[in-house]
Swiss-Prot record:
The species this protein was found in: Molluscum contagiosum virus subtype 1
Cellular compartment(s): Virion
GO molecular function, one term: ATP hydrolysis activity
Protein name: RNA helicase NPH-II
Any Pfam family: NPH-II
Self-association state and partner proteins as the record states: Monomer.
Top-level taxon: Viruses
UniProt family annotation: Belongs to the DEAD box helicase family. DEAH subfamily.
Physiological role: NTP-dependent helicase that catalyzes unidirectional unwinding of 3'tailed duplex RNAs and plays an important role during transcription of early mRNAs, presumably by preventing R-loop formation behind the elongating RNA polymerase. Might also play a role in the export of newly synthesized mRNA chains out of the core into the cytoplasm. Required for replication and propagation of viral particles.
Residues engaged in binding ATP: G197, G198, T199, G200, V201, G202, K203, T204
Catalysed reactions listed for this entry: ATP + H2O = ADP + phosphate + H(+)
Length: 684
């Protein structure tokens, strides 16, 4: 089967609805059978065999052979399968849903189909007698759908996946039947699939539901035209941050009609999982929503791997791309998603030459108006440029302001800039509700609830945190400074965003209502950002050794400094830890400094205290003593007084990054050596 039969389309409750087919409808569809292709209903043999019929057996009740699943409260006897399989139908009663044999034996439609659906059955051979029971079983299992009919209701989708409530109505381009069919063709062919389409068409919110549905029906199969035992594995939606895992996981759970995670086909996976996010009912076909780090640690436990936001070049996601390319045969399907491939399309086509590009048309659901506010200062004069930008942002909030009860997002580069702009806007625009949102903001859901409840116009001042996979219900305006802070070993620098980031930021509006995108930078100055050249290279080495990759050839993005890569390899070798031990630690611990692996490898109380420090920020004397003993030194080279504190120029004195210089602010004048606790905190 290459094409998705319409009877198995996922109900969007907009144009496609759950539907139970009658025997008369089945008979009317028979002439549409095309040549040697199996009838659409024949493919119901897969989900029935995988789910409803698992563990089923034949019984005789009041003279009728039926499945134990069909029994009523009366007495019955179990019938050996070998005996029941001798039955051959002579007549069929479409009202009673029964076949009658030449000897007068009566068997239910579903029981007959159950007996005939054995491994090796070629579905193109399914005749009407077999199809009748597949339709009955499929109706009882609630796996069929169809285009809108008179009286169609969203309520009919309740129970399709064991859901208490109906599927949410989803008028998204990604759930149109042509988009479903295109995605299914690539998924069934096991070709790498790159899903593109503007923000708001439903990639993150809808495509995972489709793949869960396909996996539930047909996952784990080699050839859909020949019935065989299925090797079922879950679908994983892999995301770069915990906040996105929680937000999207719960949104998917609600969209599938479940009031809680427990008992649903959605599982969240991130470090230190909160009890409220646990789900003990792990169905084999489930949708796992996971951080990239945890996905990479158990990659081949999944049948379909969905990597979202590939344009972000999250380190773990880029490593995962390399592993999936080298070990294609160990997963069934690879699906990559991005709103924009401006910076990546050529490399993806080279990396996965047989990839299927599935474009979902429609940039956003609503119109977006662009407004350019020019900064006349020379960007090389940072102070003048910043001061004019602040004036421009304040003026734009007067000229282009959200209505009462709506909000805007102001994108800046760093947490410090968030706080600075929040103070400015609070002072100059007291009529606005001003909120700061970034990766370290506690309880973002509660903050957004406050924004939604506000009668005032609000502004969310944010780092790129709000750039991806987030729909804010009341947002109508984006104000974009065009800045991003790119971390680097022992520091980082502020840069202009890439074209892909511009597309993402612009796409925060136009999802739920018309929007305005106000930008304060010159788009002609934008260029792609090669993040690997601003990252520690240790994880690339650790995961490459575990998965048998050749460095740097197998990497999706290769570092520019290959000599640095070699020095990092030699440095890790000096730890005296086996590659598998390093992999275990990298995939289960934060390892904010790779040198922490030496403490974790020794185990004991010190390792547990270090784990609490990394996860919760709990600092003890023992933790500091353990880290200090690693001798991670930096030298203070010089200092100058600035705004009531000293700004020190320091130099890393250990490892492959020795000689890297960074700035350190402290109220005291420091001299000599300091000891690094993390790459951005120190003790004397």
């Amino acid at each position: 089967m290459k094409n998705l039969p319409g009877v198995f389309a996922f109900p969007d409750n907009e144009t496609i609805f759950a539907h139970a087919y009658s025997q008369r409808e089945l008979e009317a569809m028979l002439p549409a059978r095309a040549g040697a292709q199996p009838h659409a209903f024949a493919y119901a043999a897969w989900p029935l065999s995988k789910h409803r019929w698992r563990g089923a057996f034949v019984c005789r009740q009041r003279g009728v052979l039926k499945l134990n699943l069909e029994l009523d409260a009366g007495a019955f006897e179990r019938v050996p399968r070998s005996e029941a399989e001798r039955f051959e139908p002579e007549q069929s009663d479409a009202r009673a849903l029964m076949h009658r044999g030449a000897d007068g034996t009566v068997m239910s439609f579903e029981c007959y189909s159950f007996l005939r659906c054995r491994p090796g059955l070629e579905l193109r051979e399914a005749g009407l007698a077999l199809l009748r029971g597949l339709v009955v079983g499929g109706n009882r299992m609630r796996i069929f759908s169809g285009v809108r009919r008179a009286g169609a209701s969203a309520a009919t989708s309740a129970g399709m996946l064991g859901n208490e409530s109906p599927f949410e109505r989803a008028p998204f381009a990604s759930l149109r039947i042509d988009a479903q069919a295109a995605l299914f063709r690539a998924w069934a062919a096991r070709r790498p699939t790159v899903v593109t389409g503007g923000t708001g068409v439903g990639k993150t919110s809808q495509v995972p539901k489709l793949l869960l549905w396909f996996n539930y029906l047909f996952g784990g199969t080699e050839d859909l035209d020949v019935l065989a035992p299925a090797r079922e594995r879950p679908v994983v939606l892999s995301l770069p941050r915990v906040a996105l895992v929680r937000m999207n996981g719960h949104a998917l759970r609600r969209a599938l009609g479940f009031d809680a995670l427990e008992g649903s086909p959605v599982e969240l996976r991130y470090g230190d999982l909160a009890p409220a996010d646990a789900n003990s009912s792990r169905s084999p076909f489930r949708l796992v929503v996971s951080t990239n780090q945890l996905t990479l640690g158990a990659l081949f436990a999944h049948g379909t791997v969905i990597l979202d936001e590939v344009h972000e070049h999250d380190q773990m996601a880029d490593i995962m791309l390399a592993v999936l390319r080298v070990h294609r045969a160990r997963v069934d399907s690879i699906v990559l998603m991005s709103a924009t491939l401006e910076d990546d399309r050529e490399r993806l086509q080279e990396f996965f030459p047989d990839a299927e590009f599935v474009h979902i048309p429609g940039s956003t659901r609503f119109e977006i108006r662009g407004v350019y506010v020019r900064n006349s200062s020379d960007p090389r004069d940072a102070r003048a440029y910043d001061e004019e930008e602040r004036r421009n942002v304040s003026a734009a909030l007067s000229a282009h302001r959200p209505r009462a009860g709506r909000c805007g997002i102001l994108f800046v580069a760093s947490v410090a800039q968030c706080e600075d702009y929040a103070r400015l806007l609070t002072r100059e625009h007291p009529e606005l509700g001003v909120y700061v949102v970034h990766g370290k903001t506690p309880n973002v859901d509660a903050l957004l609830a406050e924004v939604y409840a506000s009668a005032r116009p609000c502004v969310l001042v944010s780092t790129p945190y709000l750039e991806s996979s987030v729909t804010i219900r009341t947002v109508t305006h984006v104000y974009d400074t065009g800045r991003v802070f790119v971390p680097a070993p022992f520091g980082g620098r502020q840069m202009l965003i890439s074209p892909a980031m511009r597309t993402q930021r612009r796409g925060r509006v136009g999802r739920v209502m018309p929007g305005t995108y106000v930008y304060f930078y010159d788009p002609a100055r934008l260029a792609p950002i090669k993040r690997i050249d601003s990252e520690f290279l240790y994880n690339y080495i650790i995961y490459a050794r575990h998965y048998g990759l050749v460095l740097p050839d197998d990497l999706y993005v290769q570092p520019s400094d290959l000599e640095l890569l070699r020095r990092c390899e030699e440095y890790l070798d000096g730890f005296g830890l086996a590659p598998e031990r390093l992999f275990e630690l990298a995939s289960t611990r934060y390892l904010r400094m790779v040198e922490y692996a030496k403490i974790y490898a020794r185990g004991g109380a010190r390792a547990e205290e270090l784990n609490r420090f990394e996860r919760d920020g709990v600092v003890t004397e023992d933790v500091l003593a353990s880290i200090r003993a690693l001798n991670l030194r930096a030298r203070v080279l010089s200092a100058r007084a600035r705004r009531g504190q000293f700004l020190h120029t320091c130099e890393v004195a250990f490892g492959p990054y020795a000689g890297t210089r960074f700035l350190l602010a402290n109220r005291r004048r420091l001299r000599g050596d300091i000891f690094m606790v993390t790459e951005r905190s120190f003790v004397l």
